[in-house]
Amino acid sequence: NRMDVAQQINALKEALADNWSVTVFPEGTTTDGKSLLPFKSSMLSVLEPPPPGVLVQPVVLDYGEVSEFIGWIGEEDGLNNAMRVMARKGSFRLRITYLEPFSPEEYHGRKAIAAKAREEIEEELGATLDEPLRDFRHTVEAIRYFAPDPKTGES
């Protein structure tokens, strides 16, 4: 809800004022590793105006071949995702690529900052995959609810 977002933004402002590094995941979730969702820029309003000396450093997290398994995709809740991933046998590789930091002062507003970061991440991810990113389509089948028959109790 909007109050939670405001509280999170205030916490980010306090952290930046205390010279802490902060991490924001602007997709808000994970994908299959072969696509990139639109960035939600609300948390980047902490950079309006940018605190002195603050830089934005885009980062790519690449789980390689297990991206679809690791990803939190669809209607799975957080606990079930964590249990599924932790129950997996063996190990998996995570490649972290730190891209060139940029000054948010060079961009006008949170949406422009988010667009710049997304552009950099998209370019790196595309180069890693050796193919263009595909459109991510989150589809959930409709579930129909039928009220039980009051006489029989059956749906």
Task: Give the location of each predicted region.
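A cross-family acyltransferase "interaction/gating" segment
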Residues: 20, 32-111, 132-143
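Catalytic-core regions built around general acid/base machinery
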Residues: 11, 15, 46-49
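Membrane-interfacial amphipathic helices and adjacent loop/beta segments
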Residues: 1-14, 90
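Short, hydrophobic-biased amphipathic alpha-helical segments
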Residues: 8, 94, 109, 113-121
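Cytosolic-facing loops and C-terminal tails of multi-pass membrane proteins
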Residues: 116-120, 124-155
